[in-house]
Amino acid sequence: MGVEYLACGNIMSDRIQSEDGSYSEWNMGGPAFYALSGMRIWTPQVKLVCKTGADYADSYGRWMDDNGVTRESVRVELEEHTRYTLRYNRDGSFTPTPHFSMEHLGYLKTHADDIDEAAAGCRIKGMYMAHNCDAV
């Protein structure tokens, strides 16, 4: 049986900076990865469609391999995937610090052609798409 569901969009990792200056481990995330994880609970016929950095392989790639998810439509375009450090304040608010430029984020967006290529030859039943609007 082939792929039936696509999770399209970005993946990103976060780490927490505590008040004492210490850092948590990097935590996998991003809307497309969360969607993929949820889909995978119900079926192995899922595929992640995204552009990312080569370092994704050590965490996201390993998770995908361990959970029987193909890496076929993950396009490595840069050295590092999107990452943020979140510094939490006593009131529960936080300040995100990106480890990339906005050009980086725009460059890694999933486009319609990426989705068409990922869906070719598949009988797609559903798709999740995470994509923010660009300013015009």
Predicted features, each with a name:
Residues V3-A7, M28-A32, L108-D113:
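Short, composition-biased local secondary-structure segments
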Residues N132-V136:
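Short acidic/polar capping segments at secondary-structure boundaries
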Residues S13-G21, E25-W26, T43-Y128:
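Conserved N-terminal subdomain of the carbohydrate kinase-like
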Residues A7, M127-A130:
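Redox-cofactor binding/interface segments in oxidoreductases and associated redox assembly factors
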